[in-house]
Amino acid sequence: MATVSMRDMLQAGVHFGHQTRYWNPKMKPFIFGARNKVHIINLEKTVPMFNDALAELNKIASRKGKILFVGTKRAASEAVKEAAQNCDQFFVNHRWLGGMLTNWKTVRQSIKRLKDLEAQSQDGTFDKLTKKEALIRSRELGKLENSLGGIKDMGGLPDALFVIDAEHEHIAIKEANNLGIPVFAVVDTNSDPDGVDFIIPGNDDAIRAVKLYLGAVATAVREGRSQDLAVQAEESFVEAE
């Protein structure tokens, strides 16, 4: 089972919070102290909290649960996409469109349009159009791919959200709360932990820290999914006997 050690976290700078003047007092229980006017996060808390989150995500994945990775900050964007693809899950890494979860019906129509345009771009339909019309459609395709490409095969609402930066993604968290979807999130010292079911107190800016969280989550999810596949294989083997 994937776990992360104190040493891994120290090396990645997980313990460095934000400047003390930007803190959110609700994060006080997870703060060890301050150094040079920067809050230091208490990794004695973070390590077990993160490992609990990994165990739960592993369990969700083992039951065929769908996990949506959310991280739209430029610094995290590419790493979020990579991690989600690494474990065959879903992602939003550019802009969270309001209603992405709470207005799934409308989102589903946009996904259908995206898939139609993808098919047109591949089956030669674009070549038959005027240059202008082809350009308009390929621009629309690019825009839709950017915002919905990571969830186009999700086929319904996710079973959990894994979020990098609770402050930045507060709209996504609120939507998940409204729908009762569990939220796992990296929460820095400037963020509000309310609405996060599995809080991971840690640095949400340093790319090494972000990659550490994402890599561990992707591994936990992959392991969970393979348990599910193993169970399926065992069951079909028993049936065949």
Curated annotation (Swiss-Prot):
Gene Ontology MF terms in the entry: structural constituent of ribosome
Any Gene Ontology CC annotation: cytosolic small ribosomal subunit
Organism: Photorhabdus laumondii subsp. laumondii (strain DSM 15139 / CIP 105565 / TT01) (Photorhabdus luminescens subsp. laumondii)
NCBIfam families registered for this protein in UniProt: rpsB_bact
Keyword match Ribosomal protein: yes
UniProt xrefs under PANTHER family: 30S RIBOSOMAL PROTEIN S2 PROKARYOTIC AND ORGANELLAR (PTHR12534), SMALL RIBOSOMAL SUBUNIT PROTEIN US2M (PTHR12534:SF0)
Domain of life: Bacteria
Entries under HAMAP family matching the protein: Ribosomal_uS2_B
Encoding gene (name): rpsB
Protein name, UniProt field: Small ribosomal subunit protein uS2
One of the protein's GO biological processes: translation
Entry annotated with the keyword Zinc: no
Family: Belongs to the universal ribosomal protein uS2 family.
Keyword terms of this UniProt record: Ribonucleoprotein, Ribosomal protein
